[in-house]
């Protein structure tokens, strides 16, 4: 069995993580005390992907919870599933990172990191075949971004051949939490480009939009947003946890989605999204799921896939459905919208089918796309970063923790390179020569004629 070790860091990561465990517990029939109360052998068959069976038949999540202040941890402990986690796996400091990446990465976080790594090692040794790590964090704050990326790079050193999947909440364009978000996010992306294998890009604004527009919630709470994220997270790994006709795992996902190693930032979507009141009036069909899943409004990050092209994509369907129909629908999407897919990667959409639907639904699907339009997110953060960095605004908070301005410059140029790479492959065509110079030459001639 292939285990996944779940790590959540910072306030955002811990809140998303707590919601995620509620969803996974419900799917596997685990009650808040860790006892199995389900009704199907399938729930237990591969339960050890996310759970460790302790003495007395209790199931304990393979989760490591870290934060630099005790607040969020305390509320998880007193929450509905607080008693299910192993008490030693709560690792927290007292001081907080104060939304400062440098505190999370170099000073406060660095002091706590060894005790986190001890817990990670202990959990990893409990696995007979560790497939990889999934990390939940945000990039705008101090702990999730600074300490989260520190942990990712340390795990990278120690387990170089395991998959590293992150669910990263990017700062949103309109919903801003702190003024130094662009700094924290840019410094984090700099790390994620190098050390993560797969990054699922989420952002609050897109999630708010889904809540307003599709779920018809008048004032959505973070709980609602986290519920959306956790549905997607559970969808990404359902193939590992339940039998299916076409299975995939984290590594297969990476091989199918990443054409170039640096371009591993994915947009995710989930279907069916229906408002709470209208669920009983909807019938679900594969065409309907497919249509909603590919809908640009369904993406959980504020980048519009219609502004770019898909390099690759993967769809994970859950429920009893005909594989033939799934394949037909996916082909249908590609044929109708062929201009939104790069033509130099043939068959670039992969689908997997898992037989067990999420709790309370007949069928569902999770979408993961590697689209060049994700550069919109990076470009936006980069512009905000440059605006502040040019004036060296707020920089003393970071240099005071021992950081060098050089690091900022490096992170900035790395992010701009990433944007340029996405743009390059968006513009590339199948028939141009190796260096892609033809296009440019033709344009120049065109201009002279005028």
UniProtKB/Swiss-Prot annotation:
**Which of UniProt's keywords are assigned here?**
Cytoplasm, Cytoskeleton, GTP-binding, Magnesium, Metal-binding, Microtubule, Nucleotide-binding
Q: Which PROSITE patterns match?
A: TUBULIN
Q: What is its main location?
A: cytoplasm
* Disordered as annotated region, ranges: 426-450
Record's SUPFAM superfamilies? Tubulin C-terminal domain-like, Tubulin nucleotide-binding domain-like
| SMART domains named among the record's database cross-references | Tubulin, Tubulin_C
Q: Where does Mg(2+) bind?
A: 69
Q: Which GO terms describe its molecular function?
A: GTP binding; GTPase activity; metal ion binding; structural constituent of cytoskeleton
Q: Where in the cell is it found?
A: Cytoplasm, Cytoskeleton
One GO cellular component term of this record is: cytoplasm
Q: Where is the composition biased (Acidic residues)?
A: 429-444
Sites binding GTP sit at 11, 69, 138, 142-144, 204, 226
The family line of this record is:
Belongs to the tubulin family.
Please give the subunit comment from the record. Dimer of alpha and beta chains. A typical microtubule is a hollow water-filled tube with an outer diameter of 25 nm and an inner diameter of 15 nM. Alpha-beta heterodimers associate head-to-tail to form protofilaments running lengthwise along the microtubule wall with the beta-tubulin subunit facing the microtubule plus end conferring a structural polarity. Microtubules usually have 13 protofilaments but different protofilament numbers can be found in some organisms and specialized cells.
Query: Know the name of this protein?
Result: Tubulin beta-1 chain
Organism, scientific name: Pisum sativum
Q: What gene name is given for the protein in this entry?
A: TUBB1
């Amino acid at each position: 069995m292939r285990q996944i070790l779940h790590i959540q860091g910072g306030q955002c990561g811990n809140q998303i993580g707590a919601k995620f465990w509620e969803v996974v517990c419900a799917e596997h029939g685990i009650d808040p005390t860790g006892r199995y109360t389900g009704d199907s052998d399938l729930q237990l068959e591969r339960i050890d992907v996310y759970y460790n069976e302790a003495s007395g038949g209790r199931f304990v999540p393979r989760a490591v919870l870290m934060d630099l202040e005790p607040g969020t941890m305390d509320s998880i402990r007193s929450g509905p599933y607080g008693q299910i986690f192993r008490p030693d796996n709560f690792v927290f400091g007292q001081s907080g990172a104060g939304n400062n990446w440098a505190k999370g990465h170099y000073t406060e976080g660095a002091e706590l990191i060894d005790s986190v790594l001890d817990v990670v090692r202990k959990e990893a040794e409990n696995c007979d075949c560790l497939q990889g790590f999934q990390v939940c964090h945000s990039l705008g704050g101090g702990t999730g971004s600074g300490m989260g990326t520190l942990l990712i790079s340390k795990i990278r050193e120690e387990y170089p051949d395991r998959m590293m999947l992150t669910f990263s909440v990017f700062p949103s364009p309109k919903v801003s939490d702190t003024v130094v978000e662009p700094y924290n996010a840019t410094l984090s992306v700099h790390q994620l480009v190098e050390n993560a294998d797969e990054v699922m890009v989420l952002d609050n604004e897109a999630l708010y939009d889904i809540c307003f527009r599709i779920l018809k919630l008048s004032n959505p709470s973070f709980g609602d947003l986290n519920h959306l994220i956790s549905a997607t997270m559970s969808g990404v790994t359902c193939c590992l946890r339940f039998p299916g006709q076409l299975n995939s795992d984290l590594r297969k996902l990476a091989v199918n989605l990443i054409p170039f190693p640096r371009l591993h930032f994915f947009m995710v979507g989930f279907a069916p999204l229906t408002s709470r009141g209208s669920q009983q009036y909807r019938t679900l069909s594969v065409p309907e799921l497919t249509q909603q899943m590919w809908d640009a409004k369904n993406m959980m990050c504020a980048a519009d896939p219609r502004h770019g092209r898909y390099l690759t994509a993967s769809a994970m369907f859950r429920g009893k459905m005909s594989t033939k129909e799934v394949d037909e629908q996916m082909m249908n999407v590609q044929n109708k919208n062929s201009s939104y897919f790069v033509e130099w990667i043939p068959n670039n959409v992969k689908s997997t089918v898992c037989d067990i639907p999420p709790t309370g639904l007949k069928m569902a699907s999770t979408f993961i796309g590697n689209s060049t339009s994700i550069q919109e997110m990076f470009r936006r953060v980069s512009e905000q970063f440059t605006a502040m960095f040019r004036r060296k605004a707020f920089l003393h908070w970071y240099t005071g923790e021992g950081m060098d301005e050089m690091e900022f410059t490096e992170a900035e140029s790395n992010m701009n390179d990433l944007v340029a790479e996405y743009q390059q492959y968006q513009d590339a065509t199948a028939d141009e020569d190796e260096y892609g110079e033809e296009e440019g030459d033709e344009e120049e001639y065109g201009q002279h004629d005028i």
